Design a protein with these regions (language model features):
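Glycine-rich, proline-tolerant flexible connector loops at the mouths of alpha/beta enzymes
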Residues: 1-4
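Radical SAM/AdoMet-radical enzyme domain recognition
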Residues: 7-111, 117
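Auxiliary Fe-S-binding modules of radical SAM enzymes
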Residues: 109, 113, 120-126, 130-178
C-alpha cells in the first residue's frame, strides 16, 4: 500500500521487477506528485503504464483534498509520463456528488488532445454516515449524461489493461473515457 514513488530506489526496484521471468506488463498506480522527475527513468527500467489518481482539476479543491496540495506537480507528472512512453496514461477519477461531479466534462476534455484514458469511478459508500455515504455516489448513467456526444469504442479497441470498463471516445478525440 501507499505511494510507490516515495520509496527510495523505486527505479532500481522497477528494473528488478521488470526482469522477473514471466512478467510481460508492469504498471504502477500513483498520485502523480513525484512522477515528473522519475517518469523517464521508470520507463527505461521497464515500467510500461501508469495509473494516476486525480479527483479534481481545480487547484483549490486539490489542495483541500490532498496533503501536498500541488496540482501543477501532478499535471507535470502526467505530461512527463506520456512523454516517456508510459501509456496509455490512465487517470482514475472517483466522482463524488457535491465535490467534483461538476468536473466530469473537464476531465473528458483532457482526452481530446491527449492519449489519456480517463476512468470515472463510482464512489464506494462506507457506512450510513459521513463523507462516503450513498447520497454522494454518482451513478454511471449520470456520469455518462454529463459527457454528451460520446461514441462507444469497440470491444478490444480500448486501452490495454482496461478490464471490464465500457470505453467511449469523443468524436475526433485522441484519448478515451471509461
Amino acid at each position: 500500500g501507499g505511494e510507490p514513488l516515495v520509496r527510495p530506489g523505486i527505479v532500481a526496484l522497477t528494473r528488478r521487477l521488470a526482469g522477473v521471468p514471466g512478467i510481460r506488463d508492469l504498471s504502477m498506480s500513483t498520485n502523480g506528485a513525484l512522477l515528473a522527475p522519475l517518469a523517464r527513468g521508470l520507463a527505461r527500467a521497464g515500467l510500461r503504464r501508469v495509473n494516476i489518481s486525480l479527483d479534481t482539476l481545480d487547484a483549490g479543491r486539490f489542495k483541500a483534498l490532498t496533503r501536498f496540495g500541488d496540482l501543477a506537480a501532478v499535471l507535470k507528472g502526467l505530461e512527463a509520463a506520456a512523454a516517456a512512453g508510459l501509456g496509455p496514461v490512465k487517470l482514475n477519477v472517483v466522482v463524488v456528488r457535491g465535490l467534483n461531479d461538476d468536473e466530469i466534462p473537464a476531465f473528458a476534455d483532457l482526452t481530446v488532445r491527449r492519449a489519456l484514458h480517463v476512468r470515472f469511478i463510482e464512489l464506494m459508500p462506507m457506512g450510513a454516515a459521513g463523507f462516503y455515504r450513498d447520497s454522494r455516489r454518482v451513478p454511471l448513467a449520470e456520469m455518462r449524461s454529463a459527457c454528451p456526444a460520446l461514441e462507444p469504442v469497440p470491444p478490444g479497441a480500448g486501452p490495454e489493461g482496461g478490464g471490464p470498463a465500457r470505453v467511449y471516445r469523443r468524436p475526433g478525440a485522441v484519448g478515451s473515457i471509461g
